[in-house]
A protein has these predicted regions:
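Conserved small-residue
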Residues: 1-56
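Repeated loop/turn-to-beta-strand initiation elements of outer-membrane beta-barrel proteins
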Residues: 72-77, 162-163
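Outer-membrane beta-barrel pore domains and translocons
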Residues: 69, 80-82, 177-181, 213
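Outer-envelope beta-barrel architecture signal
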Residues: 60, 71-73, 146, 168-172, ...
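Membrane-embedded beta-strand positions of outer-membrane beta-barrel proteins
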Residues: 77, 174-176, 210
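C-terminal beta-signal and terminal closure region of outer-membrane beta-barrel proteins
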Residues: 1-10, 100, 113-116, 135, ...
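Extracytoplasmic gating/loop element in the C-terminal half of outer-membrane beta-barrel translocons
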Residues: 5-6, 10, 26, 82-174, ...
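Membrane-embedded beta-strand positions in outer-membrane beta-barrel channels/transporters
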Residues: 63-65, 152-156, 207-209
Length: 214
């Protein structure tokens, strides 16, 4: 990485590419009007060092649901998921090592800040929190964003029809529904589906209901 005068524990960015320039230092364009790359480090961190890591759009999605019934009981479960995608952990960007100046503003931070690199904690892989000379988004905060979410689980019971005939009722069903009970993912932020600058995750809900048919 070409980042002179860095202090121990500061965030380092790799210099991977550069632009071809003429004798006056002006970038050379190809026949399509785009900058030509040297394919090797040039001692400058700029747009030439940007690389395409992936996309937040899923490579493929899936959904699965089923209803199980036994006598008067019924159980419905629905799952869905997204795969082959990357997510930028903006929550860590805002509430972790890169915004420690917010401590002076009395804001809260993620617990991982306690494991920042320091002279007494040299085995940590986390930056020291000292203001860096390159405060731009990087691959350090990119994570696998695949997930499988259980959207809802509904459990119900229908009163036997032979009992309802005596009171002239067509159907009575009681049920309980749990929305968004859990999600399976390797993403370390709040929610791989909604996370942006500590945005609210998908809420969990509880519902109880009664279906009556006359």
């Amino acid at each position: 990485a070409y980042m002179p005068n860095l202090l121990p524990g500061q965030f380092k960015v790799r210099d991977v590419n550069g632009w071809e320039c003429d004798d006056f230092g002006n970038p050379i364009l190809d026949k399509n009007g785009r900058y030509k790359y040297t394919g090797k480090p040039d001692g400058v961190l700029n747009e030439a060092d940007m690389v395409l890591l992936g996309t937040t759009d899923p490579g493929f999605s899936m959904g699965f649901g089923n209803t199980f019934s036994y006598k008067g009981f019924d159980l419905n479960i629905f799952f869905y998921g997204m795969f082959d995608r990357l997510v930028y952990n903006a929550t860590r960007d805002k509430y972790s090592f890169f915004e420690l100046r917010r401590v002076l503003q009395g804001q809260n931070f993620l617990e991982e800040v306690n494991d920042s690199w320091s002279s007494t904690n040299t085995n940590s892989n986390n930056p020291s929190g000292i203001v860096t000379t390159y405060p731009q988004p990087s691959s350090y905060l990119m994570e696998q964003g695949w997930f499988i979410r259980c959207k809802n689980i509904t459990f119900g019971y229908s009163i036997p029809q032979r009992l309802l005939d005596n009171i002239k009722m067509g159907k009575i069903r009681v049920y309980a529904e749990l929305g968004n009970p859990f999600v399976i993912t390797k993403y370390t932020g709040n929610d791989p589906e909604t996370d942006f600058k500590a945005g609210y995750p998908n809420q969990r809900s509880y519902m109880f209901g009664l279906n009556l048919t006359f």
